[in-house]
Curated annotation (Swiss-Prot):
Annotated protein name in UniProt: Elongation factor G
Stored NCBIfam families: EF-G, PRK12740.1-5, small_GTP
Entry's localization field: Cytoplasm
Species this protein is from: Haemophilus influenzae (strain ATCC 51907 / DSM 11121 / KW20 / Rd)
Domain of life: Bacteria
tr-type G domain ranges (all copies): 8-290
Gene responsible for this protein: fusA
Length: 700
């Protein structure tokens, strides 16, 4: 089959925004105007096409990025048909992993902002992620019909809060309930959309007289930005010549692709105004797969390789999302970077060195599926029934293996115990959690060896709530969640010598007798964690009983004498003891060793260790004092900060036990504008008061 759309006419874009900036409604309108859906789905009714999980419709927030293919030939059918693959990304901070993951496979992004709320917190986080992956972007200021809407204020915030070189491409005609359309600053015409057909048709009109001066000033700003693309345009512009519409557009495109400017459009998705012109801007200014650098990867011999966006190159693709579909099982969303693949072909998962057969390939429209026979460079599609693929794996041609850059996912920061409401659901719960962990690399499951409980870990409290919610809805497993847990450890601070343990029962018949003398000493935390040194001389304990002594002590390490937490960083020297020809046994020596260990441990200045997290907070400068004050109250050690005019990074070490509820507290301190990440760093001695409280709680 030949290619239906040339790759130069592909646009793989993400639509990204803060919660409630109207992103899902914007995506809905894109699907409507591009002719994919015939009835507009409103988020207000809980019926939006893109938000396809029940919980999303209930909570009115987008959790899973659905990928959708749409076609667009321009508002006036002025372009040949372009294929736009839209990835809808979540806007909540607990789902930044989804955003990060979609940024990885996009070529460009539309950042949606609310004309009233402006640049909100999550917008700052998403902006930083887009910078990290160098994604060219344009902005759409939505909700121009709302009370308090102010387009130029948002443009100003893009500059001051995000450091963006924001250049308006349009100005709104009116605002709030008087918002009627936009002025196209290149054409210098007002665009008026027809309300009778939900904005499917429009007319160009003269710029309103009261806006003429403003529009000319902003057009000047736009043309100047275009002229900066090259010296010859600059000369023409400075020489007083007019630049043609073509020259302006191609120069602006060049600068957007180089991440030098952000073009700003506006409208009201809800009122069917502006999305159509924003789609034109996607086609005119955002990159095709051929406009971005070739994707880099690692060849089998560890050298660097790359794949260009071309059907001629060997097949390579990246699996960027696994979703569970109630009808067909696992759907693996993948982005094709090079080559062609047909359904039925076998490819290599180069990360796991396993072959996978592409059975059925589907193109997704929100949660509707269309089966297709082949996909080519630049396509985004989903495969059904791949066996052993997880997010971030590379699927490539067997005879040309390559591993594309792996995505990096943050370590989970919060853990809770979870148990099924009924014992009968235990196995079902295990399967459900396993399936959910496969879909979401930032979610982990393990069984706690100390308590036998199932522990789930994720990126925040909302993240885990949604996991439990999905278990109930999709897998029909009801579960109870415990309180967030901290894993403490126990160790000793001083050496003790010559502590004995004797286990003797010798009252007629076969008795039991074991006797050991040990030294106990602290080890370096960087070391092996435990060592056992046998220095028995002259056979005072026969060789066959020595392993039993080691084993008896190791069993005690699992649950320490202080509070029942694992014991770490100590060594044992066995140097004397005695035995009985008849009554000694392995069991007797095991018991003698455990008695000696308990006695020695209590004399060796035992302490409780607590996990310390490495915490990084990114906050606008005006909240630094509050953030540091709050961290200090959490027993943090602040190690330093880095600042630019928009954001301050604070580095600290904080005990994990003090970090529960931090996400919520940080949000309220900074009006939601700060974000943080944390990862385990080390164990350190807990202060006496903290240790006493933990030990007391364990006794209850």
């Amino acid at each position: 089959m030949a290619r239906t759309t040339p790759i130069e006419r592909y646009r793989n874009i993400g639509i990204s925004a803060h919660i409630d900036a109207g992103k899902t409604t914007t995506t809905e309108r894109i699907l409507f105007y591009t002719g994919v859906s015939h009835k507009i789905g409103e988020v207000h009714d809980g019926a939006a096409t893109m938000d396809w999980m029940e919980q999303e419709q209930e909570r009115g927030i987008t959790i899973t990025s659905a990928a959708t293919t749409a076609f667009w030939s321009g508002m006036s059918q002025q372009f040949p048909q372009h294929r736009i693959n839209v990835i809808d990304t979540p806007g909540h901070v607990d789902f930044t992993v989804e955003v990060e993951r979609s940024m990885r496979v996009l070529d460009g992004a539309v950042m949606v902002y609310c004309a009233v709320g402006g640049v909100q917190p999550q917008s700052e986080t998403v902006w930083r992620q887009a910078n990290k992956y160098e994604v060219p972007r344009i902005a759409f200021v939505n909700k121009m019909d709302r009370t308090g809407a102010n387009f130029l204020r948002v443009v100003e915030q893009l500059k001051t809060r995000l450091g963006a070189n924001a250049i308006p491409l349009q100005l709104p005609v009116g605002a709030e309930e008087n918002f009627t359309g936009v002025v196209d600053l290149i054409k210098m015409k007002a665009i008026n959309w027809n309300e009778a057909d939900q904005g499917m048709t429009f007319t160009y009109e003269e710029v309103p007289a009261n806006m003429q001066a403003d529009c000319e000033e902003w057009r000047q700003n736009l043309v100047e930005a275009a002229a900066e693309a090259s010296e010859e345009l600059m000369e023409k512009y400075l020489g007083g010549e007019d630049l043609t519409e073509e020259e302006i557009k191609s120069a602006l495109r060049q600068r957007v692709l180089a991440n030098e400017i952000i073009l700003v459009t506006c409208g009201s998705a809800f009122k069917n105004k502006g999305v159509q012109a924003m789609l034109d801007a996607v086609v005119e200014y955002l990159p095709a797969p051929t406009d971005i650098p070739a994707i880099k990867g690692i060849n089998p011999d560890e050298t660097e390789g790359e794949r260009h966006a071309s059907d001629e190159e060997p097949f390579s693709s990246l699996a960027f999302k696994i979703a569970t579909d109630p009808f067909v099982g696992n759907l693996t969303f993948f982005r094709v970077y090079s080559g062609v693949i047909n359904s039925g072909d076998t490819v290599l998962n180069s990360v796991r060195q396993k072959r996978e057969r592409f059975g059925r390939i589907v193109q997704m429209h929100a949660n509707k599926r269309e089966e297709i026979k082949e996909v080519r460079a630049g396509d985004i599609a989903a495969a059904i029934g791949l066996k052993d693929v997880t997010t971030g794996d590379t699927l490539c041609a067997i005879d040309a293996p390559i591993i594309l850059e792996r995505m990096e996912f943050p370590e989970p920061v919060i853990s809770v115990a979870v148990e099924p409401k009924t014992k009968a659901d235990q196995e079902k719960m295990g399967l459900a959690l396993g399936r959910l962990a496969q879909e979401d690399p930032s979610f982990r499951v393990h069984t706690d060896e100390e308590s036998g409980e199932t522990i789930i870990s994720g990126m925040g409290e909302l993240h885990l709530d949604i996991i439990v919610d999905r278990m109930k809805r999709e897998f029909k497993v009801e579960a109870n969640i415990g309180k967030p847990q901290v894993s403490y450890r126990e160790t000793i601070r001083t050496r003790v010598n010559d502590v004995e343990g004797k286990h003797a029962k010798q009252s007629g018949g076969r008795g039991q007798y074991g006797h050991v003398v040990i030294d106990l000493y602290p080890l370096d935390p960087e070391g092996p964690g435990y060592e056992f040194v046998n220095e028995i001389k002259g056979g005072v304990i026969p060789g066959e009983y020595i392993p039993a002594v080691d084993k008896g002590i190791q069993e005690q390490l699992k649950s320490g004498p202080l509070a029942g937490y694992p014991v770490v960083d100590l060594g044992v020297r066995l140097h004397f003891g005695s035995y009985h020809d008849v009554d000694s046994s392995e069991l007797a020596f095991k018991l003698a060793a455990s008695l000696a260990f308990k006695a020695a441990f209590s004399k060796a200045n035992p302490v409780l260790l607590e996990p310390i997290m490495k915490v990084e907070v990114e906050t606008p400068p005006e909240y630094v004092g509050d953030v540091i004050g709050d961290l200090s109250r959490r027993r943090a050690m602040v190690n330093g900060q880095e600042a630019n005019e928009f954001v301050v990074k604070i580095y600290a070490e904080v005990p994990l036990s003090e970090m529960f509820g931090y996400a919520t507290d940080l949000r309220s301190q900074t009006q939601g504008r700060a974000s943080y990440s944390m990862e385990p760093l080390k164990y350190a001695e807990a202060p006496t008061s903290v240790a006493a409280a933990v030990i007391e709680a364990r006794k209850k």
